[in-house]
Amino acid sequence: MQIQNSHDLSSSNTLQLRSLAERFVELYTPADLSTLLMNPELKNLPWKILGGGSNLVLPSQIEGLVLKVSNLGRKLIHEDPDYWFVKAQAGEVWNDFVQWTLEEGYWGLENLSLIPGTVGAAPIQNIGAYGVEVKDTLWEVHALDLQTGEPRVFSNKECQFSYRDSYFKQEGAGRYLIWDVTFRLPKKNVLHLEYGDIRKEVERNNWPQDPRHVAQAVINIRQSKLPDPKVIGNAGSFFKNPIVSKELRDGLLSKHNDLVSFPYEDRYKLAAGWLIDRAGWKGKKLGPVGMYEKQALVLVNHGGATADDVWKLARQVSSDVHTQFGVEIEAEPIRW
């Protein structure tokens, strides 16, 4: 374990923002964390946890110590007549893990294919796509207490999941470091084809309706709409889909008959991309940043942007959507 000073994080965040960490270290074992906690100088610094950097807006300068979780490994740890229990270390790339489960014949995560980031970051955000969220199959989270180094296991309920949110993003933020995650994947195959164009993509290719082809359909759709962060800096979907009352949704629908919405519990989820597009921001730039020309929900860095540029655009887009539709849209990435 090596502590690095003035570490450049420009290539460690998918928005490709220029950012310099005062101190930086990669963790491979729980003992590495214990070593840090025994160092009075380091222990008293502010700490930040870095995963794949795909859901972060980083400032130009980061004071304190940035910890990157780099542990790797994935395996089947148990099965019963109804479920497979699969564990993945936090440092695993999320999509690599999803594709591995499918190769091994375990399904349930196929709709979450090609989402950027790491396994450890997935529960924090309760990542989701095409009608599926991490909370649907997550069994438990193994975390380390950043104050003591002691392990703690969180059940699904204790994670307090909600839409793009969890305990680890709220009360537990900065307190726990997620070390590994166990998923309970159903042996009874239930496909989710109703969201987006998944069914159309499967049928267009004359594929059988099975998990591996659903995953490929999701990959094809995402690649056609979302920019590769290695080519154009972005954090994927930048805004959450707002959840509104039936009354507000019906009122909007009476004025906009092509409004895109989905039932969500006893309310409705509106497509933020549709709102942003109709507010005139699809393909539009503000300085070095803009909303992607193929998907209005994606904020992109055209080069040389800072966190201030990102938030200036986000505020303007949000304001224009609210002015036109009376709906608040909230940024999804975490602000450091």
Curated annotation (Swiss-Prot):
GO terms for molecular function: FAD binding; UDP-N-acetylmuramate dehydrogenase activity. The active site is at R164, S237 (proton donor), E332. Residues 17-188 form the FAD-binding PCMH-type domain. Keywords: Cell cycle, Cell division, Cell shape, Cell wall biogenesis/degradation, Cytoplasm, FAD, Flavoprotein, NADP, Oxidoreductase, Peptidoglycan synthesis. GO terms for biological process: cell division; cell wall organization; peptidoglycan biosynthetic process; regulation of cell shape. Its main location: cytoplasm. It catalyses: UDP-N-acetyl-alpha-D-muramate + NADP(+) = UDP-N-acetyl-3-O-(1-carboxyvinyl)-alpha-D-glucosamine + NADPH + H(+). It is found in: Cytoplasm. Disulfide bonds: none annotated. One of its GO terms (cellular component) is cytosol. SUPFAM superfamilies: FAD-binding/transporter-associated domain-like, Uridine diphospho-N-Acetylenolpyruvylglucosamine reductase, MurB, C-terminal domain. Its cofactor is FAD. It is an enzyme of class 1 (oxidoreductase). PROSITE patterns: FAD_PCMH. Its EC number is 1.3.1.98. InterPro entries: FAD-bd_PCMH, FAD-bd_PCMH-like_sf, FAD-bd_PCMH_sub1, FAD-bd_PCMH_sub2, MurB, MurB_C, MurB_C_sf, Oxid_FAD_bind_N. The keyword Oxidoreductase applies. Pathway: Cell wall biogenesis; peptidoglycan biosynthesis. Belongs to the MurB family. Cell wall formation. HAMAP family: MurB. This is UDP-N-acetylenolpyruvoylglucosamine reductase. The gene is murB.
